[in-house]
């Protein structure tokens, strides 16, 4: 494990301990144990990409200067705030989607003693973020900007989730509602803001930058987040479950996935009818038929072409940015996700 990742995980223990001894609430042994178990189960279990990228980005913005212990701690704390936000979304998301597994283990709400208590746990996870920010950033000149940033990104993500849910669930299953612009809107709000823009925005604020002056950085990161989600949609169907850590269910769940949107675009009338009949059905035979159609339409090749075009376009945007340090941050992000398998 890299030294920074080790330091990052140490900061998790510090933050957890502070939250379990928060003076605003008198914990009993039971409640403290519950929160600790809930945190350990839901917060540090993923790849930690979003959290670690705050430190990476901050380091690159400092252009190779050695970071002080304080800078490592603070950038890690912001990284963990994003991981907390992610945990809060995922715990509630899994309930809404009736998912079974997450990160290779049963979803939190599926555990026998948890069930719907998970809803309140999600709310607690969300409430931990301002506690962490208050404790460690209250005296910083960018404190209010940080609070604004987290609030705004949370609002954008929840609104993206809403478009996703109402497009997917409300009324009759109607594939004709699905198109690239709808897919793009969902992805932009539901994933790109918190996964791509938020970590870099945190690093920029810590470096004393004004976010208003970096709207082009936001645009590039949202574009990158869109590309990331298209990869995710692709891997949901074509990735190996043991590699991606979950069993893909986008077809059964009638998700507005890039694959189905592309399939609709490329299908003839007969194939469209076939999709309408089989997409969103929970039986393995229908899922297999949809996958077969995806193969007939050569969606793996279509994706490979999309991937290389997106990469070239992003590199062009990034290299037009005036700051070398910001370019380095953006290229580092792109390098982490290009051609990923999980």
Swiss-Prot record:
Q: Which UniProt keywords apply?
A: Carotenoid biosynthesis, Cytoplasm, Isoprene biosynthesis, Magnesium, Metal-binding, Protein transport, Transferase, Transport
Q: Where does isopentenyl diphosphate bind?
A: 47, 50, 86, 103
What Gene Ontology cellular component terms go with this record?
A: cytoplasm
Q: Which residues bind Mg(2+) 2?
A: 93, 97
Regarding activators and inhibitors, the annotation says:
Stimulated by methyl jasmonate (MeJA).
Instruction: Quote one Gene Ontology molecular function term.
Output: (2E,6E)-farnesyl diphosphate synthase activity
**Tissues expressing this chain:** Mostly expressed in roots and seeds, and to a lower extent, in leaves and stems.
Induction cue: Induced by methyl jasmonate (MeJA) in hairy roots. Induced by A.niger mycelium-derived elicitor, thus improving ginsenosides production in adventitious roots culture. Triggered by salicylic acid and yeast extract. Influenced in roots by relative humidity and rain, and in leaves by rain.
Instruction: Read off the InterPro entries from this record.
Output: FPS1-like, Isoprenoid_synthase_dom_sf, Polyprenyl_synt, Polyprenyl_synt_CS
State the needed cofactors, names only: Mg(2+)
E.C. designation(s) = 2.5.1.10, 2.5.1.1
Q: Which PROSITE patterns match?
A: POLYPRENYL_SYNTHASE_1, POLYPRENYL_SYNTHASE_2
Q: What Pfam families does the database record attribute to this sequence?
A: polyprenyl_synt (PF00348)
Cited function: Catalyzes the sequential condensation of isopentenyl pyrophosphate with the allylic pyrophosphates, dimethylallyl pyrophosphate, and then with the resultant geranylpyrophosphate to the ultimate product farnesyl pyrophosphate. Component of the triterpene saponins (e.g. ginsenosides or panaxosides) and phytosterols biosynthetic pathways. Promotes the accumulation of ginsenosides.
What is annotated about its quaternary structure and interactions? Homodimer.
Identification of the protein by name: Farnesyl pyrophosphate synthase
**Lineage, opening ranks:** Eukaryota, Viridiplantae, Streptophyta, Embryophyta, Tracheophyta
């Amino acid at each position: 494990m890299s030294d920074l990742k080790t330091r990052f995980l140490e900061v998790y223990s510090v933050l957890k301990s502070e939250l379990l001894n928060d003076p605003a609430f008198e914990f009993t042994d039971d409640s403290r144990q519950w929160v600790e178990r809930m945190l350990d189960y839901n917060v540090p279990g993923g790849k930690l990409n979003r959290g670690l990228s705050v430190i990476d980005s901050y380091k690159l913005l400092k252009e190779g200067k050695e970071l002080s212990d304080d800078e490592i701690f603070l950038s890690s704390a912001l990284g963990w705030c994003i991981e907390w936000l992610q945990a809060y979304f995922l715990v509630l998301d899994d309930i809404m989607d009736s998912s079974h597994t997450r990160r290779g283990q049963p979803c939190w709400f599926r555990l026998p003693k948890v069930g719907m208590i998970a809803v309140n746990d999600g709310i607690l996870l969300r409430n931990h973020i301002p506690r962490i920010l208050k404790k460690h950033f209250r005296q910083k000149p960018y404190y209010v900007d940080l609070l604004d940033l987290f609030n705004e990104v949370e609002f954008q993500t929840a609104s993206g989730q809403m478009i996703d849910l109402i497009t997917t669930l409300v009324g009759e299953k109607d594939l004709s509602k699905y198109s690239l612009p709808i897919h793009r809107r969902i992805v932009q709000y539901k994933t790109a803001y918190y996964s791509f823009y938020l970590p870099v925005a945190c690093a920029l604020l810590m470096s004393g930058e004004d976010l208003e002056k970096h709207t082009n950085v936001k645009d590039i990161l949202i574009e990158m987040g869109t590309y990331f989600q298209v990869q995710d949609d692709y891997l949901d169907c074509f990735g190996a479950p043991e590699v991606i850590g979950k069993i893909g269910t986008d077809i059964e769940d009638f998700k507005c996935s890039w694959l189905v949107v592309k399939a609709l675009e490329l299908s003839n009338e007969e194939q469209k009818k076939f999709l309408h009949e089989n997409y969103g059905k929970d039986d393995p035979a229908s899922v297999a038929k949809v996958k077969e159609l995806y193969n007939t339409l050569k969606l793996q090749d279509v994706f490979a072409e999309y991937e290389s075009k997106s990469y070239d376009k992003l590199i062009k945007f990034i290299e037009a940015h005036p700051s070398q340090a910001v370019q380095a941050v953006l290229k580092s992000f792109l390098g982490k996700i290009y051609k990923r398998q999980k």
